[in-house]
Amino acid sequence: MKKYNKLRIEWDCRRGMLELDKIIMPFYLTHFHELTDDKKDIFIRLLASTDLQLFSWFFNLAKSQDVELQMMVEYIQKVQKIIIN
């Protein structure tokens, strides 16, 4: 089991858009500990994306070209019960 810098991850979860703060931080606080190490690594990579990228992915305006990131976005949408038509 890998060790993760929880303070760094929590800091990276803080975004410049309130909409993203309402999605990403609650997911981190509630579900991050349940993820496998591989999925935790993908989540951390997701946090390196820009706010505009994340907004477009979470609100289904675009899809990430990175399959793993897109799968993580869809997983977060599912567990956070985000319904965007």
From Swiss-Prot:
Superkingdom of the source species: Bacteria
Listed under GO cellular component are: cytoplasm
Q: Name one GO biological process term.
A: succinate metabolic process
Q: Please provide the record's keywords in A-Z order.
A: Chaperone, Cytoplasm
Q: Where in the cell is it found?
A: Cytoplasm
- What task does this protein carry out? An FAD assembly protein, which accelerates covalent attachment of the cofactor into other proteins. Plays an essential role in the assembly of succinate dehydrogenase (SDH, respiratory complex II), an enzyme complex that is a component of both the tricarboxylic acid cycle and the electron transport chain, and which couples the oxidation of succinate to fumarate with the reduction of ubiquinone (coenzyme Q) to ubiquinol. Required for flavinylation (covalent attachment of FAD) of the flavoprotein subunit SdhA of SDH and other flavinylated proteins as well.
To which protein family does this belong?
Belongs to the SdhE FAD assembly factor family.
Q: What is this protein called?
A: FAD assembly factor SdhE
